[in-house]
């Protein structure tokens, strides 16, 4: 994947790269950024959604809670995770782990790559809308630092429910949008073939989002997954150190102001 420094890409090209099968996986990120990861399972209410991997880990020597969306690596796993689209149990698992992190004063790290929340019948029957809304509500006042990194697709409320961070960063070949370009084109123009045009209108690329101050920064990508993990780790570490210097009241006020300005 070419770096931002190499050449300018169209929005459609960024969308394609964000969706690429060559995109770094959740498992590689966990191993490359954190140590001693211990996975926790289940939402303690209904099920364990494999589209969300979460647990405890060390970032350098700092204990953190890390929550990652998982698109799967083999066909069977991709089907089980709905290609990285969480069900309500996944969002509730994320909330459970984040609340536990706040209880023990651990920072929360979200690594997000999802086209959106799973839109299937089972998800709606089990309260998909409520689960997303609950996360938005609870994360807005969670008394511990939250850092989110979008490393692929950041689609709709399904991504926002995991990206209510004090700091939000994106990999250069990633997207963050209210809906997919295909969905936008189909709804507004009744023509999904105009997806490339819609991608430009949506301004879903990291460069556009940085200009609008929706994200804090862009992490350049590399052909080397090890080098990319180091870059993400450095960014998270720097942001975490700054956030931990704030009093809880300051942290929450800054978070409130961050999202109110949108």
Describe the predicted segments one by one.
Residues 1-186, 190, 200-262:
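Terminal-region recognition feature
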């Amino acid at each position: 994947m070419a770096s931002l420094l190499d050449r300018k890409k169209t929005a459609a090209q960024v969308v394609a790269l964000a969706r690429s099968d060559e995109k770094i996986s959740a498992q590689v990120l966990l191993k490359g950024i954190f140590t001693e990861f211990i996975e926790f399972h289940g939402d303690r209410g209904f099920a364990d959604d494999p589209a969300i991997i979460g647990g405890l880990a060390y970032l350098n020597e700092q204990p953190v809670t890390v929550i990652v969306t998982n698109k799967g690596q083999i066909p069977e796993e991709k089907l089980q995770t709905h290609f990285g689209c969480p069900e309500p149990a996944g969002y509730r698992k994320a909330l459970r782990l984040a609340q536990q992190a706040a209880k023990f004063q651990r920072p929360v790290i979200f690594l997000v790559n999802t086209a959106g929340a799973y839109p299937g019948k089972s998800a709606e029957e089990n309260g998909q809308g409520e689960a997303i809304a609950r996360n938005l509500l609870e994360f807005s006042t969670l008394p511990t630092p939250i850092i989110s990194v979008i490393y692929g697709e950041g689609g709709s409320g399904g991504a926002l429910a995991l990206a209510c961070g004090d700091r939000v960063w994106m990999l250069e070949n990633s997207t963050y949008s209210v809906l997919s370009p295909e969905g936008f084109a189909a709804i507004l123009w009744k023509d999904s073939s105009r997806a490339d045009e819609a991608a430009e209108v949506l301004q879903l690329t990291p460069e556009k989002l940085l200009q609008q101050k929706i994200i804090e920064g862009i992490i350049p990508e590399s052909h080397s997954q090890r080098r990319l993990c180091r870059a993400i780790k450095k960014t998270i570490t720097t942001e975490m150190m700054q956030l931990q210097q704030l009093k809880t009241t300051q942290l929450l006020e800054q978070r409130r102001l961050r999202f109110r300005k949108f």
